[in-house]
Amino acid sequence: MLPSQSPAIFTVSRLNQTVRLLLEHEMGQVWISGEISNFTQPASGHWYFTLKDDTAQVRCAMFRNSNRRVTFRPQHGQQVLVRANITLYEPRGDYQIIVESMQPAGEGLLQQKYEQLKAKLQAEGLFDQQYKKPLPSPAHCVGVITSKTGAALHDILHVLKRRDPSLPVIIYPTAVQGDDAPGQIVRAIELANQRNECDVLIVGRGGGSLEDLWSFNDERVARAIFASRIPVVSAVGHETDVTIADFVADLRAPTPSAAAEVVSRNQQELLRQVQSAQQRLEMAMDYYLANRTRRFTQIHHRLQQQHPQLWLARQQTMLERLQKRMSFALENQLKRAGQQQQRLTQRLNQQNPQPRIHRAQTRIQQLEYRLAETLRAQLSATRERFGNAVTHLEAVSPLSTLARGYSVTSAADGAVLKQVKQVKAGDTLTTRLGDGVVISEVSAVTKTRKPRKKAANP
């Protein structure tokens, strides 16, 4: 018998595709450490090699657009750290990794730690812009946390002296390289916050390798910078060097010299600003005086224009103009009123009702005469019809019949007697005659026989 539900059947292509999707989606991007072997670079520029350790190996491919960023030439037997995506080459079913970046093993481990710490602190929000403190403008005192013998301190002091010689500088000397450097940098930041002598801090050093700059990728240093109440400007290495301290600091400067320029005012620029402000002030004063003079002249002219005699003369002239306008307006109004009166008189004469009244009265008299004639004719005809109707009614009236000797007898219930079967002995009858009524009682009822009809002759 067949099972109730058949199992899923994969083709080879579908199986390889499914495995590839599982590897790519479930594993994602990973870091792998191993030894290079079987390294080849065909004309396409891509790299193909095997990455192995003591017990296993895996095929690797690094395409040209990725390997051109590698700063060294991979060698057979070299230990490296790679960042790669796991996939499967479907036509052959070969499991392999696609390398995105490659570093020598020692430096690669540091880079891996760097990426892990960066992701951790970013997830905690230490890099968020909302926590960045604004720098003072201008700064009244600058604190410098760096090596007292390094080139970075020399560059910072040189720039500050050139730009703003009067700006106080407090140096918090500390080691910037080695195992003790992170702890010393943290203590220097905490000391600067405790003493609260300056309103901005420069934390940094000169350039170097990733190992040389590693103190500024230390988690303790990053958290000390984040916790500082005083704004911190990071100035580590060269412009291409980016450390964890740069992400946490309130502002990143590409070099120590650039940091000194950020926190200081340019004395020459300040002098130019003062001179420019002085020029603007002089121009503003000249403009103000010219404006006041022009305003005074306008007011003086207005006062002259508003002298009482001039005012009276203008009012007199205006009064005369108004009188002329009023006289002209009255004349025009009277003229228009007279013309309108003439037009109305003509219209009234044209619409005089007397002729129409006379014609209406004549028409009424004619209608009254015709109405009277019509009423007389109708009344005469009605009287004639009434007389004929009376004569006809008298001819068919029951009273006339009674007057000729006939009578009408009715039973007690008022029904007119037509047959003897309507009464019985003892009933009271009412007989109406021509000149009165006779009430009688029935003593006997006799029915007469109808005469037989004669038979027709054959």
UniProtKB/Swiss-Prot annotation:
GO terms for biological process: DNA catabolic process. Its EC number is 3.1.11.6. It is found in: Cytoplasm. Keywords: Cytoplasm, Exonuclease, Hydrolase, Nuclease. Transmembrane segments: none annotated. It catalyses: Exonucleolytic cleavage in either 5'- to 3'- or 3'- to 5'-direction to yield nucleoside 5'-phosphates. InterPro entries: Exonuc_VII_L, Exonuc_VII_lsu_C, OB-fold_nuc-bd_dom. The keyword Hydrolase applies. It is an enzyme of class 3 (hydrolase). Its main location: cytoplasm. One of its GO terms (cellular component) is exodeoxyribonuclease VII complex. GO terms for molecular function: exodeoxyribonuclease VII activity; nucleic acid binding. It comes from the Bacteria. Belongs to the XseA family. Heterooligomer composed of large and small subunits. Bidirectionally degrades single-stranded DNA into large acid-insoluble oligonucleotides, which are then degraded further into small acid-soluble oligonucleotides. This is Exodeoxyribonuclease 7 large subunit. It comes from Escherichia coli O17:K52:H18 (strain UMN026 / ExPEC). The lineage of its organism: Bacteria, Pseudomonadati, Pseudomonadota, Gammaproteobacteria, Enterobacterales.
